[in-house]
Amino acid sequence: MTDVTIKTLAAERQTSVERLVQQFADAGIRKSADDSVSAQEKQTLIDHLNQKNSGPDKLTLQRKTRSTLNIPGTGGKSKSVQIEVRKKRTFVKRDPQEAERLAAEEQAQREAEEQARREAEESAKREAQQKAEREAAEQAKREAAEQAKREAAEKDKVSNQQDDMTKNAQAEKARREQEAAELKRKAEEEARRKLEEEARRVAEEARRMAEENKWIDNAEPTEDSSDYHVTTSQHARQAEDESDREVEGGRGRGRNAKAARPKKGNKHAESKADREEARAAVRGGKGGKRKGSSLQQGFQKPAQAVNRDVVIGETITVGELANKMAVKGSQVIKAMMKLGAMATINQVIDQETAQLVAEEMGHKVILRRENELEEAVMSDRDTGAAAEPRAPVVTIMGHVDHGKTSLLDYIRSTKVASGEAGGITQHIGAYHVETENGMITFLDTPGHAAFTSMRARGAQATDIVVLVVAADDGVMPQTIEAIQHAKAAGVPVVVAVNKIDKPEADPDRVKNELSQYGILPEEWGGESQFVHVSAKAGTGIDELLDAILLQAEVLELKAVRKGMASGAVIESFLDKGRGPVATVLVREGTLHKGDIVLCGFEYGRVRAMRNELGQEVLEAGPSIPVEILGLSGVPAAGDEVTVVRDEKKAREVALYRQGKFREVKLARQQKSKLENMFANMTEGEVHEVNIVLKADVQGSVEAISDSLLKLSTDEVKVKIIGSGVGGITETDATLAAASNAILVGFNVRADASARKVIEAESLDLRYYSVIYNLIDEVKAAMSGMLSPELKQQIIGLAEVRDVFKSPKFGAIAGCMVTEGVVKRHNPIRVLRDNVVIYEGELESLRRFKDDVNEVRNGMECGIGVKNYNDVRTGDVIEVFEIIEIQRTIA
């Protein structure tokens, strides 16, 4: 066969010349592109490539087995543990030369073992034979000595006994020969047993050394191929080893003892204490008693306190705080008791308390703000930069029946007061009025004492307060309260002295009384404008409007008109056909129909907007009051209204506020429970008046609830079981029946299903339209629960003139009735020198010798006092009776 060049061979093999030259170089043959290749060189290259591309030197097998192990537990119960054993083994392909070398070593090892075994057997045989010969020689010597003794003794005996002695000697000789044979057999068995044990020991030692040499030679697999336990449980490890032996069929037994010992650095290895305990258990013997390890320490090293960074939200439970500090809940409770606060492990505590406890225990506290989402939503709003003048928001305040609503009616030329029950404004009305000089927004607040929170809310949302004072009535309690609200809000006050047309009007007295509370007229050097008006005659109305606009110019009121709107809820209620309705006063921006609003705990999209006249509007600018529809629920009056971008985020913020309010409420309730614990223990039985309250608007619900709760006394407490806005439903009636409560409807009525429940349960249902009547009737109901007052009333006096002795009653006082009537079986007091010396009961009352029930003034009688004999002449017997007086709540 002719030689071929590198280029030709590369073309045949369909590879590049450079790659082929490199392959020849790897095979130890240096060639260039133009060199020729012989057949031997080609065969060398092929052998090299076959060896290089042969199968893998290593083969890795992974196996996973699952089993269940029943572990005995405390109390005789056992629990099942699922065990999963994962194995990974690597098998290495041996080199043929290495295999031959190992085979030769094994053959030499086997020959050495066989030689050692034969030598041991021969040595044991020699020792056994020598020992048997020595024992036989000694036995023969002993027998010869005994025979000599017996022969000497036989010579002294009578000759007729020689035949018998001969027979006995023969039998004894046979017996001795048998004993010698038995002794020789036992010696041979003992020698054979020792020989076998020695051979077995030598073979086991040789096999162990061979196994160790084999594993040392095959030590190429790394720690990944080592067999390790996947659990630290002793029972699970035993089950794993049993499973390994079943699967492997006894393969690799030579290293079981070695593998049972965990390697250094193995994270699954047992601890030192566990290993000592296992060794002690093995050494325990038949009794199975464990002995304490002598190497185990008798003390534990004290652990150093770890100071952690504890992140605390606005509220947290005691258990969660303990987990954050990695301590037991009992330690946190002890720390709180040291600080003077009692708590349970599930109690919610506020951020300040949790901070004190954590710092007291040596940890660093990180306070977390939980309203980050809320702040992000509020900051992502479009607000215009240019501020424009806006209309003033004016709140009319004053005492009840001083003419606030009538004054506003005249300004608006409507009859709003006629629609209010009893002529009293029940909730805030918001109206905007167009005048010749500009627009003014009026807020009408109730003047009754119950509506304090509503009045305060009106003052916070206003720019100017018009204080209406009746000229004939002067300053009244609600007038003073309105002044305080105005001062707290920091808004200017314009005083409207109303009812100036009445003959008994005295405006100067009004000025003097208001000056005592810091409201000084301008003519006296003060800052407040005083305007004399008459809501009925219409006098002074223009002057009042001019004064309001003048004050607004001084304030330079401005607001951003463009951008997302924000404002406040003036009033809210639940309409049966429209759902939740909120009266909103826009402060800045423009509120459009379709905007997404966030309002306290509620959110929603503005589906419709109406002004105070009930007309549909599409937008509302600053200082404009509107009713909006589309909220998820009835918001609380006074809540902030904000237009946001995303309805989903608005919902998240609303839900977060609800959860936060609930947590704070629970924390407050827990705190009040702990603080009032001892007070509740001592106050005894307290009667409760349960009430389910429904009203037309949210403001009325708040006002009535506050007024009723203030009626509570130490003996009778008012408890509002449920309250809400809207008509009385079947759910309200069921709640009232379950809690034995009174159903109160303020400007609302019960529906048909609720009336059926009320009739079936015979519930007490009451309708009201004026708050005075509601409070008076609840007072009457509470008065009926008061226990009556016991009063002692003196009905007669009798003077002791003489004392007689009676065998039946003892000392009998002969008396003259000086005042009133003395009645039998009534309680009495015995007075001596006007000092009570005894209080008891009149047992016997006689006139002459007849028993009588009563003796009137000016008559003589005999009186026997029960269980009392120390009656003297000159004493006065006072007869009284106990009467019950029904108490009332003031």
Swiss-Prot record:
Per the UniProt record, one Pfam family is GTP_EFTU_D2
- Region annotation (G5) ranges: 534-536
Alphabetic keyword roster = Acetylation, Cytoplasm, GTP-binding, Initiation factor, Nucleotide-binding, Protein biosynthesis
N6-acetyllysine is carried by which residues? Answer: 808
PROSITE patterns in alphabetical order: G_TR_2, IF2
Record keyword Ion transport present: no
- Where is this chain compositionally biased, Basic and acidic residues type? 92-217, 267-280
Listed InterPro entries: DNA-bd_dom_put_sf (IPR009061), EF-G-like_DII (IPR053905), EFTu-like_2 (IPR004161), IF2_assoc_dom_bac (IPR013575), IF2_II (IPR044145), IF2_N (IPR006847), P-loop_NTPase (IPR027417), Small_GTP-bd (IPR005225)
- Cell compartments where the protein resides: Cytoplasm
> Bias regions of kind Basic residues — which residues?
252-266
Query: What SUPFAM superfamilies does this protein's entry cite?
Result: Initiation factor IF2/eIF5b, domain 3 (SSF52156), P-loop containing nucleoside triphosphate hydrolases (SSF52540), Putative DNA-binding domain (SSF46955), Translation proteins (SSF50447)
- Residue ranges of region G3? 444-447
- MF GO annotations: GTP binding; GTPase activity; guanosine tetraphosphate binding; translation initiation factor activity
Can the keyword NADP be found in this entry's annotation? no
Q: Which residues form the tr-type G domain?
A: 389-558
Residues that hold GTP according to the record = 398-405, 444-448, 498-501
First-listed, main subcellular location of the protein, grouped into a coarse class: cytoplasm
Q: Where is the composition biased (Polar residues)?
A: 67-81
Biological role: One of the essential components for the initiation of protein synthesis. Protects formylmethionyl-tRNA from spontaneous hydrolysis and promotes its binding to the 30S ribosomal subunits. Also involved in the hydrolysis of GTP during the formation of the 70S ribosomal complex.
HAMAP family, alphabetized: IF_2_B
Family of this protein? Belongs to the TRAFAC class translation factor GTPase superfamily. Classic translation factor GTPase family. IF-2 subfamily.
Name of the featured protein: Translation initiation factor IF-2
